[in-house]
Amino acid sequence: MKVPIETSPLAWLEAVEQQRRGAGLRRSLRPRSAVATELDLASNDYLGLSQHPDVIDGGVAALRVWGAGATGSRLVTGDTILHHELECELAEFVGACVGLLFSSGYAANLGAVVGLSGPGSLIVSDAYSHASLVDACRLSRARVVVTPHCDVDAVDTALRSCHEERAVVVTESVFSADGVLAPVSELHDVCRRHGALLLVDEAHGLGVRGGGRGLVYEVGLAGAPDVVITTTMSKALGSQGGAVLGSSAVRAHLINTARPFIFDTGLAPAAVGAARAALQILKAETWRPEAVLQHARTLAKICDLSELPQSAVVSVVLGDPEVALAAAIACLDAGVRVGCFRPPTVPAGTSRLRLTAHASLDSAKLEVARRVLTDVLGGCCVARR
């Protein structure tokens, strides 16, 4: 809808804001307190490590040695031994050859997808791909084919029609909105038949699947030369930052071509130190990933879902965005913080509550979740699917 400009070049914003309100799609910020007073079923702190004393100490120690900021791009003054140590440790953990840190998972996806495709390339992307992957596809200047969710046959068809010099298949390992696992092994078979690269975003797989090493590792593709992994330290590792994991050739190429790497300040030392400490805990305390999955199954049963989750994400589809938002607010008022996903994050008609399981949940917390979720969802059962 084109809104005529009247007295200000930003006068149109009010009309757009009214449209958002009318559609039940307005978003706003809700600052949380330092000490949570509600049960957290919304954050991505899957392993409960963001507040772990060793993780905090790791961040503080790096802060004291290296300072508050990286002070520049990795190619100028922002590169430290600390960055290289985390790259090596993370790559070894997931079974990749080498790694390259970025300032966020979003930046890692932009750098990897754009850097490994470009004009004269074909990108095949899942319809439920994260916004960072979608934006990367748009920026790549490659031909992009979007396939139905987890449809391997559609990917095969797209690759059969490829007339470009190279092709990249892009998927999340665990889809952030619905928690569904991608058919990574089957996608790799298709990619291998057609000589395509498989790029897997392990943002929600790291720390949960494959004993914490991710879904790519779980299905036996760790270190495969035609597989590139992207991930983040902001979820299971409780810190911040992103990484691309793959071959030495991929790393060298991205150092020279990935604009989010070349022109961005390096990841803050405190985030690197915290992520390193979290990774050590994940290696030592192998019970944490399985605890996440067990608690996710419990939450699914509480919500009376027909399918048990295979990740930390428990998706409760309510349909209408206003119903979903009202349910999320009701949960928060009752002491349980849950996620609320509405368009454009999810397709129209599939607005939902997104619950996330954490290793730190216990029987008392799960009982609180049961009481609140049963009461709130019981009030909107007509809209549930």
Swiss-Prot record:
Pyridoxal 5'-phosphate binds at G105, Y106, S176, D201, E202, A203, H204, T232, M233, S234, K235. Its cofactor is pyridoxal 5'-phosphate. The keyword Cell membrane does not apply. Pathway: Cofactor biosynthesis; biotin biosynthesis. It catalyses: 6-carboxyhexanoyl-[ACP] + L-alanine + H(+) = (8S)-8-amino-7-oxononanoate + holo-[ACP] + CO2. The modification N6-(pyridoxal phosphate)lysine is found at K235. Substrate binds at R27, H130, T345. Its EC number is 2.3.1.47. InterPro entries: Aminotrans_II_pyridoxalP_BS, Aminotransferase_I/II_large, AON_synthase_class-II, PyrdxlP-dep_Trfase, PyrdxlP-dep_Trfase_major, PyrdxlP-dep_Trfase_small. It comes from the Bacteria. Keywords: Acyltransferase, Biotin biosynthesis, Pyridoxal phosphate, Transferase. GO terms for biological process: biotin biosynthetic process. One of its GO terms (molecular function) is pyridoxal phosphate binding. PANTHER family: 8-AMINO-7-OXONONANOATE SYNTHASE, CLASS II AMINOTRANSFERASE/8-AMINO-7-OXONONANOATE SYNTHASE. Belongs to the class-II pyridoxal-phosphate-dependent aminotransferase family. BioF subfamily. Homodimer. This is 8-amino-7-oxononanoate synthase. It comes from Mycobacterium leprae (strain TN).
